[in-house]
């Protein structure tokens, strides 16, 4: 578990972006929250892994990767279209002279996780994840990185791919797993445990 935690922290620091300076301290804090929450698929995937829902973890990975691929493909297409003289004002970031604002990658990431939880585990567990996803979208707008249209389109793309790639979770009635323990004398014990739910 400690190795997994260290690996997560290393990945978080490695992928941490260079950020623009927002208008005020409140917007800066909100932007930081949004930057951390874009890793929501990793957090949700960790929960699926802890539940031993390997199929769900795979579906989350596929949905998130396809979403990000489509979003970054669209960003590149709109940027190239602008260079070729096509009017794509909706793709311009509000903060700067960048034409890679449509759709929002942060919104796509967090709504991949939210859509996955909704379609895999149901609406009740999805409520807090959806709230965090909406907070991330708001952080991108307040920070001046995206318009409302850009985060909405990114969110809808992610939700659509979550719908396509996610199946309903059906817990297994039985489990077979290895058991390793030691007794009070320090001797190791190895075995196999079987459990069945009625």
What is the predicted role of each segment?
Residues 173-183:
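Transmembrane beta-strand segments that form the barrel wall of outer-membrane beta-barrel proteins
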Residues 47-52, 121, 163-173, 196-198:
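Outer-membrane beta-barrel proteins
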Residues 186-198:
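Outer-membrane beta-barrel "beta-signal"
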Residues 106-110, 146-166:
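Alpha-helical transmembrane segments that form the membrane-embedded catalytic/substrate-binding core
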Residues 2-6, 11-102, 108-141:
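Hydrophobic alpha-helical bundle signature of multipass membrane enzymes
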Residues 112-116, 160, 193-195:
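Outer-membrane beta-barrel architecture
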Residues 79-84, 145, 149, 170-175:
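Transmembrane helix-loop junctions in multipass membrane proteins, especially transporters and channels
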């Amino acid at each position: 578990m400690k190795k997994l935690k260290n690996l997560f922290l290393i990945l978080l620091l490695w992928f941490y972006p260079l950020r623009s300076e927002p208008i005020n301290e409140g917007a800066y804090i909100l932007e930081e929250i949004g930057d951390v929450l874009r890793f929501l698929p990793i957090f949700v995937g960790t929960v699926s892994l802890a539940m031993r829902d390997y199929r769900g973890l795979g579906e989350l990975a596929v949905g998130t990767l396809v979403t990000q691929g489509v979003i970054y493909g669209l960003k590149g297409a709109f940027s190239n279209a602008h260079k070729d003289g096509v009017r794509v004002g909706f793709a311009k970031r509000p903060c700067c002279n960048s034409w890679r604002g449509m759709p929002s990658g942060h919104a796509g990431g967090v709504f991949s996780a939210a859509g996955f939880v909704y379609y895999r585990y149901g609406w009740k567990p999805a409520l807090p994840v959806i709230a965090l996803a909406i907070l991330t979208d708001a952080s991108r707008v307040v920070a001046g990185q995206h318009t409302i249209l850009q985060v909405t389109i990114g969110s809808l793309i992610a939700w659509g791919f979550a719908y396509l790639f996610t199946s309903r979770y059906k817990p297994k009635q039985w489990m077979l797993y290895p058991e390793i323990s030691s007794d009070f004398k320090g001797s190791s014990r190895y075995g196999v445990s079987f459990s069945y739910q009625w």
